[in-house]
Design a protein with these regions (language model features):
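Active-site-adjacent structural elements in enzyme catalytic cores
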Residues: 1-158
């Protein structure tokens, strides 16, 4: 499935940053190394619009095995988190492919997403109109936190 998504996006999964969505904080610790301070920070800010870059564990999906780091998300979206819970597995995530000349509605409207991608994906879930602002990316692999990209989320330190 991951390789199929990468073909659709025309990206190399070994070279591009991919993230996984986890259901809850306990499932995050299966796939990433989380110390007490980072755990408290994540507990305070998640679920929410953040991607935390953490050191990975050996339980990561195969496509991530040669990487030291992994992006972890726990979005404030009950649909995707419930799917991850029911699967009892993380879900790989990436942004939709977007070209500058395209209307942004094709990134946010489930009906338009289905119109554009319905022939090449198995399923489009209509969870309502989505937002276009990206997640805030926080690197937590060193001793100090680093905001790699300021997006929708404003990190509240504990």
């Amino acid at each position: 499935a991951i390789e199929r998504i990468c073909r659709i996006k025309e990206i190399d999964p070994r070279k591009n940053n991919l993230s996984i969505i986890c259901y809850d904080l306990s499932s995050i610790s299966e796939y990433a190394k989380v110390d007490n301070n980072i755990f408290k920070l994540m507990k305070h800010n998640l679920p929410g619009p953040f991607t935390f870059i953490l050191n990975g564990t050996n339980r990561l999906p195969k496509i991530f095995r040669n990487r030291k780091e992994v992006g972890i998300r726990m979005p404030d979206n009950n649909i995707i988190r419930e799917i991850a819970r029911l699967l009892d597995a993380p879900i790989m995530t990436t942004t939709l492919p977007y070209e500058e000349h395209e209307d942004l509605e094709y990134m946010t409207d489930p009906e338009l997403i289905d119109e554009k991608f319905g022939d090449i994906v198995d399923l489009v879930i209509d969870g309502g109109i989505g937002g276009i602002e990206p997640s805030t990316v926080v690197k937590c692999t060193d001793d100090e936190l680093e905001i790699i990209r300021q997006g929708k989320g404003w990190l509240e330190e504990v």
